[in-house]
Amino acid sequence: MAQIRIHEINTRIENEKEVQLFLQKEDVLYEKWDISKLPAHLQNNYALTDENKEEILTLFSNEIADVSQRRGYKAHDIISLSSATPNLDELLINFKQEHHHTDDEVRFIVSGHGIFAIQGKDGRFFDVELEPGDLISVPENVRHYFTLQDDRQVVAIRIFVTTAGWVPIY
């Protein structure tokens, strides 16, 4: 279950209902998908083959189709980041630059953890700490950045309206 940390006052929201209500008020889509159907050989696997990626996409094809139909998304892929990722530190420096997109930024966490820092409607930033099973959609034109948690690894399904709209605007 995702948790929230509000930067300026270092307040945490950990209760499931309170997290959902907070994100709903910020117009951030949050869903919890059933991660238990992920087979053991794909759990915490950060060296995915093309076949592994296709298997993950197939496992979650109904959920991807549902959210895509509801929200107008048209494309998806998988990203895997870990200590084995070439230039991981350089990638994380880029990811941590505050930016926005002209489309939603949608991620479903398959393995590992990630943090989206999002600028709230009041101008304050808050972290959404994500774990396997969490889906988040940062609305278009909302300032944010992404980083990893202490384990420095994540596998995520990325879902797009268009890949062109996903280009960051710094």
Curated annotation (Swiss-Prot):
Residue(s) at site: May play a role in metal incorporation in vivo: 98
SUPFAM superfamilies: RmlC-like cupins (SSF51182)
Sites marked May play a role in transmitting local conformational changes: 104
Positions that bind Fe(2+): 99, 101, 105, 144
GO biological-process terms attached to the record: L-methionine salvage from methylthioadenosine; L-methionine salvage from S-adenosylmethionine
Cofactor(s) needed: Fe(2+); Ni(2+)
Annotated keywords: Amino-acid biosynthesis, Dioxygenase, Iron, Metal-binding, Methionine biosynthesis, Nickel, Oxidoreductase
Gene Ontology MF terms in the entry: acireductone dioxygenase (Ni2+-requiring) activity; acireductone dioxygenase [iron(II)-requiring] activity; iron ion binding; nickel cation binding
Reaction catalysed by this enzyme: 1,2-dihydroxy-5-(methylsulfanyl)pent-1-en-3-one + O2 = 3-(methylsulfanyl)propanoate + CO + formate + 2 H(+); 1,2-dihydroxy-5-(methylsulfanyl)pent-1-en-3-one + O2 = 4-methylsulfanyl-2-oxobutanoate + formate + 2 H(+)
Cofactor note: Binds 1 Fe(2+) cation per monomer.
Pfam name, any one: ARD
Pathway: Amino-acid biosynthesis; L-methionine biosynthesis via salvage pathway; L-methionine from S-methyl-5-thio-alpha-D-ribose 1-phosphate: step 5/6
Residues annotated as binding Ni(2+): 99, 101, 105, 144
Record-annotated site: Important to generate the dianion: 107
EC number: 1.13.11.54, 1.13.11.53
Quaternary structure (record): Monomer.
Function: Catalyzes 2 different reactions between oxygen and the acireductone 1,2-dihydroxy-3-keto-5-methylthiopentene (DHK-MTPene) depending upon the metal bound in the active site. Fe-containing acireductone dioxygenase (Fe-ARD) produces formate and 2-keto-4-methylthiobutyrate (KMTB), the alpha-ketoacid precursor of methionine in the methionine recycle pathway. Ni-containing acireductone dioxygenase (Ni-ARD) produces methylthiopropionate, carbon monoxide and formate, and does not lie on the methionine recycle pathway.
Similarity comment: Belongs to the acireductone dioxygenase (ARD) family.
Protein name: Acireductone dioxygenase
UniProt organism field: Bacillus cytotoxicus (strain DSM 22905 / CIP 110041 / 391-98 / NVH 391-98)
Gene: mtnD
